Amino acid sequence: MEYEPVIGLEVHAQLLTESKIFCGCSTKFGAAPNSHTCPVCLGMPGVLPVLNKKVVEFGMKMALATHCRINEECSFARKNYFYPDLPKGYQISQYAYPLAEFGYVDIEVEDGKKRIGLTRIHMEEDAGKLIHDPHNPSSYVDLNRTGVPLIEIVSEPDMRSAEEAAAYLRRLHEILVYLEICDGNMEEGSFRCDANVSLRPRGESEFGTRTELKNMNSFRNVQRALEYEIKRQQYILEGGGSVVQETRLWDDSQGVTHPMRSKEEAHDYRYFPDPDLVAVKISADWVEAVLREQPELPLEKRERFVRDYGIPPYDAGVLSSSRPLADYYEEVARQSGNPKAASNWVMGDLLRFLNEEKREIRDCPISAASLGELIRLIDQGTISGKMAKEIIEEMYRTGKTAPAVVEEKGMVQITDEAALSGVITGILEANPNQLAQYRSGRDKLFGYFVGQVMKATRGKANPQVINDLLKKMLAG
């Protein structure tokens, strides 16, 4: 029997607000343990939470970017469970009345695009962090993360392979980072994913028993964990067994999943409305104000780059992979007036330099205006492409502009026809045998004469001018 995987993802994105969702404590990562806490996020008696407006607006940004319906009214609920990193004994989340519902994102698959539905986007607070001591049985609790704002993005079970799930996750990550509402750092836990996966006979509409996968801290691990879990469930079903509904942890070092606990249902958490927080009313004017601040999203930008700049889809995908890189490329294209050359130089030499030093485009020592100026010098014939390779290295190393490097190194290309004619005449007179052979039909010697001219001018002669003059002068 052939089985079909059914996959849904729950993504938690930590929002880039300066303060927590219900108090004024800092959200900055890496501070001393328990230094960013107060009576509100520690769950002390007699204190009341106050909702951070920016959290709602960041959630609305993601909802708009993923074509969700933003509800006119949403409210918070208490999710009750015990864990050492949850000081109140409950987590403030949303349940019956989330921020937004019924959205979608499109992903690229082998045969085109596929639409993945979003069930909901809701706001909630993060829990603290347990730190386990490897040298003794103690565990320590750091509550700095308690109350840090999250949005949870819940997909429909629309994915049918681990590859589709990884593509969907990358698309969400790309949108969140483009919107500048989440830094997307999976290692620090600001972008986390849980996966629900089940198998069913191909062609059936009823879902199988699902397992939830946790502890996946990279796109690669999400794909590997799902691939393993699909094979594990298939082995069980083909052997006549039954899949147990449970939560499993991914073990990256062994490449397997391990049972963690039985899978909870919503009723296990005893959700009820939080009496300390009023409902949030979202007006059409508020939605419109947030919409006006939305940037162009990566998929739209990619399509525009192909359409308006005439660059290949692959190049457009690389150049729009991050908002700062896309902005840099567009400025180079504007400054140079040559979008295709701008694409080649940014994707080629510039990204190579940055990748070698593990630097971001924001830290690039060559400004977009300077790179555009370099491309203009090539297009004007002032320097050759070969010269430009040497010049851009010097620009990257020193931060100097292209004209400054050209002047300093005396690298201006020779385009004066009279001067080059004199050089060519001397070379032809010094090579009578090669000249005679060329004129008798050995056309390949043309390259020899080009090389001699470049050697005589130390590579400064304009190749196009040389070619034109040589053709005339060799013809006799």
Swiss-Prot record:
SUPFAM superfamilies: GatB/YqeY motif, Glutamine synthetase/guanido kinase. It comes from the Bacteria. Its EC number is 6.3.5.-. PROSITE patterns: GATB. Keywords: ATP-binding, Ligase, Nucleotide-binding, Protein biosynthesis. NCBIfam families: gatB, PRK05477.1-2, PRK05477.1-4, PRK05477.1-5. Heterotrimer of A, B and C subunits. PANTHER family: GLUTAMYL-TRNA GLN AMIDOTRANSFERASE SUBUNIT B MITOCHONDRIAL AND PROKARYOTIC PET112-RELATED, GLUTAMYL-TRNA(GLN) AMIDOTRANSFERASE SUBUNIT B, MITOCHONDRIAL. Belongs to the GatB/GatE family. GatB subfamily. This is Aspartyl/glutamyl-tRNA(Asn/Gln) amidotransferase subunit B 2. It comes from Syntrophus aciditrophicus (strain SB). The lineage of its organism: Bacteria, Pseudomonadati, Thermodesulfobacteriota, Syntrophia, Syntrophales.
